[in-house]
């Protein structure tokens, strides 16, 4: 996997730690855009009902949750990097159909469609590999380049990095951002901090500039 390196660093020496997630929220990519170096948390235990395997998009009926099905282990504590994807049904096809229904009429869906579609056709074994690939794809689409490393041990408290790991819990991810035009905004109003896909399909190449103007 290749993730591109930022050429303009808004805050040199800023190192953030964050969870890889499935087409992450806008706040996730804002944290990355503000960073000099990104550290991905690889040693955490998997928790249900978090954004490790779910994403929120703006559908014709309002906010919609897309959940990535995983195989649950009998072990009390299973590391996220060891979690395997459920392959009993074609959830990838369902997810892409949902994205088409939500964003086919957006300004930039067709522009990025060929970049996004392949990940829904590829069969991954592990959730972590899927998450990292979706982040790599989005980084390329945004032209957002950054250096990154991975943890080799879990620490509850981090003192040498800006800790954004709480963003993986959607209930604690309460950041509010400047509104931008959304496909169904006139029908349902502005929906804040959805998947980065929502920003990408609506703002296109301007999405990175939008991120740089926001505060987290």
Description of each model-found segment:
Residues 2-216:
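Residues lining hydrophobic/aromatic ligand-binding pockets adjacent to catalytic sites
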């Amino acid at each position: 996997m290749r993730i591109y390196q930022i050429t303009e660093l808004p805050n040199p020496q800023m190192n953030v730690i964050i969870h890889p997630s499935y087409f992450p929220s806008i706040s996730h990519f804002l944290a990355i855009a503000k960073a000099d170096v990104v550290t991905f948390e690889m040693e955490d235990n998997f928790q249900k009902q978090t954004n490790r395997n779910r994403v929120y998009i703006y559908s014709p009926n309002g906010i919609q949750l897309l959940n990535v099905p995983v195989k649950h282990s009998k072990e009390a504590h299973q590391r996220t990097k060891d979690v395997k994807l459920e392959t009993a049904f074609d959830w990838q096809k369902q997810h892409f159909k949902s994205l088409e229904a939500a964003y086919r009429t957006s300004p930039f869906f067709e522009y990025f469609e060929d970049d996004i579609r392949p990940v829904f056709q590829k069969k991954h074994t592990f959730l972590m590999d899927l998450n990292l690939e979706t982040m790599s794809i989005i980084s390329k689409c945004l032209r957002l380049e950054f250096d990154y490393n991975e943890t080799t041990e879990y620490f509850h408290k981090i003192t040498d990095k800006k800790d954004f790991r709480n963003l993986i819990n959607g209930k604690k991810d309460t950041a509010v951002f400047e509104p931008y035009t959304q496909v169904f905004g006139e029908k349902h109003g502005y929906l804040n901090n959805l998947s980065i896909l929502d920003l990408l399909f609506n703002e296109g190449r301007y999405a990175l500039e939008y991120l740089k103007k926001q505060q987290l």
